[in-house]
């Protein structure tokens, strides 16, 4: 008999999957920060998920997903992205609000609704924030994506993905008309790593706290 995972377990599994995709070692302290829960709550949740064969925990505290746990996490990640597309493309919700709303909706999407949404958005390759469907940040790396903060003066690039978990950051980018698909050039790179950007006859200055949250593809000069 298949055991149904709880909303809490789905959140934990997706958070672990996202950390792994981003290249960050999943440990209890990082999970507590990511999910805004206490360390004892993480310890108790991991104990239950180990019992249910969803995760494994190494002696050094590194957390990994079992095959069963990864399948659930990837399904939740996909449903999250489908929920974001439904919210932005159909309902018209601003992209800055889509992530938080999708965090709640993803748990209510059934296999039937998932299938219908996949058909509805068959032409889409990524969520509104640019995260590839069925691949996440690992797929971004395979596509040759780099952080905007890595670029040098006189390089050109196209934004392909932005950090989606900070609504204020997304509102900030919106105000600068910086979205996936926007092309820009680096006019200057300062000693403190502030970049002077040019895009559509506009000049703007972005510090590393912003440029380290934007993934781009380099364009030929």
Please give the residue ranges for each predicted region.
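Extreme N-terminal segment that seeds HTH/winged-HTH DNA-binding domains in transcriptional regulators
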Residues: 1-36
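Basic, amphipathic "hinge/linker" alpha-helix immediately C-terminal to the N-terminal HTH DNA-binding motif
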Residues: 61-80
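A short, conserved structural fragment
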Residues: 50-58
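Short, hydrophobic-biased segments on the C-terminal half of alpha helices
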Residues: 46-47
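Mid-protein regulatory/catalytic core that forms ligand/cofactor-binding pockets
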Residues: 106-212
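Key DNA-contact positions within bacterial/archaeal DNA-binding proteins
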Residues: 40, 96
């Amino acid at each position: 008999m298949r055991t149904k995972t709880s909303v809490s377990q789905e959140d934990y599994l997706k958070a672990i999957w996202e950390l792994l995709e981003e290249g960050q070692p999943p440990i209890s302290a990082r999970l507590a920060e990511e999910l805004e829960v206490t360390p004892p709550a993480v310890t108790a949740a991991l104990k239950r998920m180990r019992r249910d064969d969803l995760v494994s925990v190494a002696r050094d505290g590194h957390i990994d997903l079992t095959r069963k746990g990864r399948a659930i996490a990837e399904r939740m990640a996909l449903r999250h992205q489908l929920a974001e597309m439904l919210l932005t493309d159909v309902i018209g919700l601003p992209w800055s609000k889509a992530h938080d709303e999708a965090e709640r909706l993803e748990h209510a999407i059934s296999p039937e609704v998932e299938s219908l949404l996949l058909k509805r958005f068959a032409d889409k390759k990524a969520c509104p924030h640019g995260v590839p469907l069925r691949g996440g940040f690992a797929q971004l790396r395979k596509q040759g994506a780099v952080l905007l903060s890595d670029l040098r003066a006189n390089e050109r690039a196209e934004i392909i993905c932005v950090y989606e978990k900070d609504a204020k950051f997304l509102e900030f980018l919106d105000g600068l008309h910086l979205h996936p698909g926007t092309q820009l050039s680096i006019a200057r790179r300062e000693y403190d790593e502030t970049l002077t950007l040019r895009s559509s006859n506009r000049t703007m200055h972005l510090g590393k706290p912003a440029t380290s949250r934007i993934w781009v593809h380099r364009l030929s000069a």
